[in-house]
Amino acid sequence: MAENPFSTGKARYLHTMIRVKDLDKSMDFYTRLLGMKELRKKDFPSGEFTLAFVGYGEETAQTVIELTHNWDQDEPYDLGNGFGHFALAVPDVATACDILASEGVEIPRPAGPMKHGGSVIAFIKDPDGYLIELVERN
């Protein structure tokens, strides 16, 4: 029987894909406000969509976010109730929230300790309403 490719230590989590209504607005949010880099972007005219990859490091070493923009999407996406959030580590959650709030970013859960733990966290929303948890890590 062949070796399970997921248990060889060579499998790796590559990216999470989210659909975005306004690619320019999302690119600005993830690059300018959250400090990620645009890693690559490609239009697919025959499928009428664009894929853009953003992250804090190269895809060969880091997990990144794939932003999918369907050109004919006029309405906001229904985010459903299955997806919760993804998390980013920052050295100072309160300062990060202050900076993001000054840019008009919605902060549904301000910086503070977790209810059932000691970590300082906050939740912000991206332009499409996806929740992003900020976790304080020094």
Identify the role of each PLM range.
Residues 10, 17-62, 102, 115:
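Core segments of cupin and vicinal oxygen chelate
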Residues 2-9, 12-21, 39-42, 50-57, 63, 75-101, ...:
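Vicinal oxygen chelate
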Residues 1-27, 83-86, 135-138:
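N-terminal beta-strand motif that seeds the catalytic metal site of vicinal oxygen chelate
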